[in-house]
Amino acid sequence: MDITEIMNLIPHRYPFLLVDRVLEIDLNKSILGIKNVTVNEPQFTGHFPARPVMPGVLMVEAMAQLAAILVAKSLGSTKNKEVFLMTIENSKFRRIVQPGDTMHIHTVIDQQRANVWKFSSTVKIEGEITAESKFTAMIKDKA
């Protein structure tokens, strides 16, 4: 799935669109996508100018955006729905992510009850687990 289809599924836009491509999707189960980290991203002007490091919170946001894509594809559409992050749990960051890295993000649906979905996600760089997190999202009708 390319960036055009991604932009049709989730509302995020530059500079906050943090998924570049979806490589695999197994509806109602899991999704694998990538984020190419480049020095031109605005967070690197202040985090940190001498040694740019991808903020952990943005890695978690990329995981959550991938989850929103999985929800949209699994439901068939989210045009009349919104996906909101409710909780973030057990986030761990094991390695620095910097410009030039490609984040391979794997997100799995752990549980789904009514409009509350639970996920677990990992980020790998060159096959090495770099970050992981569990989070919960709520799917609501648009107002």
From Swiss-Prot:
Disulfide bonds: none
Record bears the keyword DNA damage: no
Entry EC no(s): 4.2.1.59
GO biological process per UniProt: fatty acid biosynthetic process; lipid A biosynthetic process
Gene3D superfamilies, A to Z: Hotdog Thioesterase
Molecular function per GO: (3R)-hydroxyacyl-[acyl-carrier-protein] dehydratase activity
Annotated compartments: Cytoplasm
Catalytic activity as recorded in UniProt: a (3R)-hydroxyacyl-[ACP] = a (2E)-enoyl-[ACP] + H2O
Catalytic-site annotation from UniProt: H47
GO CC annotation, single: cytoplasm
UniProt key word Chloroplast: no
Keywords associated with the record: Cytoplasm, Lipid A biosynthesis, Lipid biosynthesis, Lipid metabolism, Lyase
Function: Involved in unsaturated fatty acids biosynthesis. Catalyzes the dehydration of short chain beta-hydroxyacyl-ACPs and long chain saturated and unsaturated beta-hydroxyacyl-ACPs.
Protein name: 3-hydroxyacyl-[acyl-carrier-protein] dehydratase FabZ
